[in-house]
Each structure stands twice: as structure tokens, then as C-alpha cells.
Amino acid sequence: MKTINYAAQGLAVFGLAALPLAVHAQASSDDQASPTVELNPMVVTAALAPRTADQSLSSVTVIDEAALRRQDPASITDVLRGQPGVDVTTQGNFGKQSSVFIRGTGSNANVLLIDGIRLRSATTGAASWEFLDPRMFDRAEIVRGPRGSLYGADAVGGVVQLFTPEGEEGSPQPRISVGGGSFETQRYSASLSGAEDGTRYHFAASRFDTEGAPVRRDGDDKGHDNTTGLVRLSHTFDSGAEIGMLALRSKGSTEFDASGPAEDDFVQQVAGIYTELPLTERWTSRLTLSEARDERDTLAPTYSSLFETRTRTAQWKNTLALGQHEVVVGAEYSEDDLGDSQTSGLAFNEESRDNRAVFAQGLLDFQPLTTQLSLRHDDNQAFGEELTGSLALGYELDARHSLRASFGTAFRAPTFNELYFPFVGSSNPDLEAETSETVELGIRGQYDAWFWDLAAYRTEVEDLIALDASFRPVNVNEARIRGAELSAGAEFDGWTLATALTYTDPEDRDTGNRLARRATQGLRLDIDRELGEWSLGASWIAQNHRYNDGANEQRLPGYGIVNLRAGWQLAPMWSLRATVENLTDKEYATAQGADFDLATFESIPFDYINAGRAGFVSVHFGP
């Protein structure tokens, strides 16, 4: 089989794509033309205060509403796949278990936020990305690098934050979408949003239903359905005080394969209320109360289980403006509760734990030098105290180019499965948290019509949790992750281009092997063109091979897929969109499962294959 060097291909494609960008960027600079979409967006996840992308001192990617509409993705993982530093694995197609790796760290070593509220399973430590409907969100921010000093446990590789829409000033704006396509897929969504007299509102609902496709060769179709509702309200008083609330709930089921037909019934929910008070001209105080719920009820041929997490959080954050500088201090209390979680009728040895934290951040501006300094102390009932911190420095070389350097620490909390799983000998209540240190260097160029960003990093992880010879989790391993990311984007004359190249070297220092399920090379190229009433676009996503296991014996080949999209503005309020996924009908797998042969007592691996070529069409009403 011919081996494809995806990095070499990517560099060639990047060069071809960047050539016209550079030529046009010079022309745009000369005539001061403005891009149709902001290329230097405001980012709120990289720090505890908003900053533009070139001021954030972080490696960050923003996916705005326009990009989400163009791609019209079926899942959030479709949006994240191939973004700089991001690797996604799935156990099949729609609604099947998915893992997101950021900068080579584990799927339970990154954080998912929805409008600032964290969502995850405390039993696995990871988020259920596969159950999130992308039509509920109008923006995504991906911040790469440690953020433990801002967000606490598990922010080792990075943070992904999804934002729900806010109502815009004016009369109510309805939106309706109806669509369907391959695998007997049906999608419906509707929303109503607006703002008047200081009150903003957004209401939305969606339904996704599909018969699905096989998740293994010669297997049966595995279906999925998901119903989601969203309410977001806020009011700003004449004094500047603000109150608001958010409620997002998804409920559905997904079929999968576990040595026979199996099904998950799931519920995902986030809810929160907040108040923000301008106590003085320089001091703003914000109090947030929230609850996140992740529930998965599984029925399989050989077992049944219920895993439920309720995380309740109270956070008090204070922002002080001191001239061109800014200081943030706060405190946070959270509690994880497993409720009625059990597997095969056995309950967990412990069902709850709490965490108390205090944090502080300083954003210091001494142009052309800027500094971000942060510190956080966590005291967890289960594994004790952890102190994390970070220091980032930025230097403006000129009006268009800036350098950045940072050092940060983070930790991954042991999960309830690792600490208290009910099967004898399969858990360890004496586990300590995994700890990490990361050094990063970056340089960014920001122009009128395009940008580029290059970053290199090194992460050292200690006390990595792994299974010993008796399959009991222990703190034994160390890992070293080295990598580099190159990204660029442009907007000109109706063209929108974005490209990302990723190199990651995630090594288990004890064995010298690559960490499981991580690719080392990745490429993503998005090209879109507006032609009056029409729009056309394509994405190319490619990755090299990976290993399903830590022993590096189960090799999964690399792949490259092409997705196409088109849109037609039928009337001012009506549009038609069509997408083709996996144009070349490439069969590929990013994860494996295993069957157990009772006759030979052997484990027989099989590939979780992704869906083949698929087409979808949808009609949209609204602005």
C-alpha cells in the first residue's frame, strides 16, 4: 500500500492556498479594503476577560456563525475535526461515542464549556460530544494549551467553549429549518429571538432522527435520535446591572454494537442563572449558579448500566479595571453527584465529592509588552489540593506581527471510575491527580484581509494513570508531548479560506510508544465562495495512521476525506443548502472495538467504520 505523507501534502496545499492570499492581502493593504468577516475576533475563553485573538497570548481558533451556517454540520465533532491541534475519534457515525484530543492529551484532559457552564461525565471524566446539536450554537472557541489556573481540573490540553445565540435588538426574528438525506435522516429546527427595552431572548428547539449506518463491516444500521430545547433570557437595567438565565436540554437514544445490539438512552442538560453588578466604575462583580447533568442508561446483551452526573457550581468573579491593566479574582464551589449510577446492579463505593477553589488573574499592558499571570488553588474532597499557575508574555514587533511565550501547569482529576468503580480490584481510591507542565512559543501575523499563526509547544505529564498487571489503575506512567501548529485564514472578494496543519508527537515515556488513538499529522483546508445568490464550498480533512492501543500493535490507517457544500438564496428570507459528506466514499476508522470469543477466550478486534458517502438537503426560513 502506498504511504501518503499528509504533512508534505498539507505544506504544498497551504503554499498554493497562501499564494493568492498574500498577493491579495497586499492589494487590500494598499486600498484599505475591509474583509466581509472579522478576522481578528474577540475571544473570551483564553482569559477571564475578553481579548482579540491577536491580544489573547494563546493559540486560539474561533468558528463563527457564518462558518457554522456554511458547513451545516450534523455534529459538533464535524466542526472540531481537523482544527489546529484537535484530533477526533468516533466509534461509528451519528450519535456514537466520540473522543476529542487536544494537543495529544487524553479525551478526559480537556474541558467543554457551554456559555461558561462545564459539561462532562464525572465517571469517565470526558464530555459526551456526540449528543450536542450544532444548530443550538452560533459560535465556538478552541483554546489550546493548559488552562488549569483558570478552569481547574482537566484543562490540560485545552478548552472548547460553545456559545448559544443572544437576541439582537429589534422585532422578533423567527428561523425554521427542515431537511433530510442519506440513511433516512431527518432534521428539524426552529428558533425565535429578539431584544427590546434591555431584555434579550432566544428560544430554540431541534429534532434529529436517522436510521444510521453500520458501525462495523457487515453489521446492521445503528440509529440515533436527539431532541433538544434551549431557552436563554437576560435583562440589563438602566444602572448597568444585568441578570440572565440559560437552560439547554437534549434527550434521545443511540444504537451501538457491544457483542450484539445495544442502546444508550441519554440526557444532557445545562442550566444556570447569573447576576452581574457594576459596583463602581472600576469594579464589576458577577455571581453564577449552575447545574450540569450528563446521564447515560445502557442496555447491552451482557450488561446494563446507568451513569449519571450532576455537577452543581457556584462561582463569584470580580473584575477590577486599573487603567490599562485588569485584575480578576474569585472563588468557586462545585459538587459532583452520581445519583443512582450503577453497573450490572452494583453501585459506586462513593457517590459524591466537592471542590473548593480560589483564583486570580492579572492582565498587564505595558505596550509593546503584555502579560497574563494567573493562579488557582483547588481543594478536592477526593484527591486533595492542587495549585496551578501560568505566565504568558506577548510582544508586538510592529502593527501586524506579535510574539508570545508561555509556561503553564495543569492537572487531570482521577475519575469516579478510576477511584470508586464497583467491580473488585478495578479501582483505586488512593490515586493522585495527573500533573503537567507546558512551554509554548508562538508568532502571529494579522493583516487587513488575512492572518497566519504558528505555535510550537512541549508538555510533560507526570503521574499518568494507567492499568497495572492486575488491571488496577495506578499512578505510574509519564508522557511527553511535542507539537507544532500552523493556521491561516483569509476573506476577500467573496472568498473565504482557512487552513490548518498539525503535528503532534504524544509519547509514553515508559515504553517509547505513541499514546493510543492519536494521529501525529493532520490537515484541514476549507474553501468557500460567494457568488451572488449562490455559495459553494469544500473541505479536505486528512490524518495519518494511529494505533488503537498503547502497545502500538493495532494499527489504523490514515485517511483523507472531501466534503462539499452549496447554498442558494431563493428569496430574502428563504434559502436552500446541500452538503455531500465523504465525497469519495472512503472507508476509514479512528477506533476499534473487540469481541470476546468464549470458545478460545480471546479478544477479537474490529474496526468502528465511519459512514460512507452521504448527501443532505435543507430548506431554511429566516434572516
Give residue ranges: language-model regions:
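Outer-membrane beta-barrel domain signature, strongest for Gram-negative TonB-dependent receptors
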Residues: 196-198, 222-337, 452
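C-terminal beta-signal and adjacent terminal beta-strands/loops
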Residues: 462, 568-623
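Extracytoplasmic beta-strand/coil segments of soluble accessory domains associated
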Residues: 77-117, 121
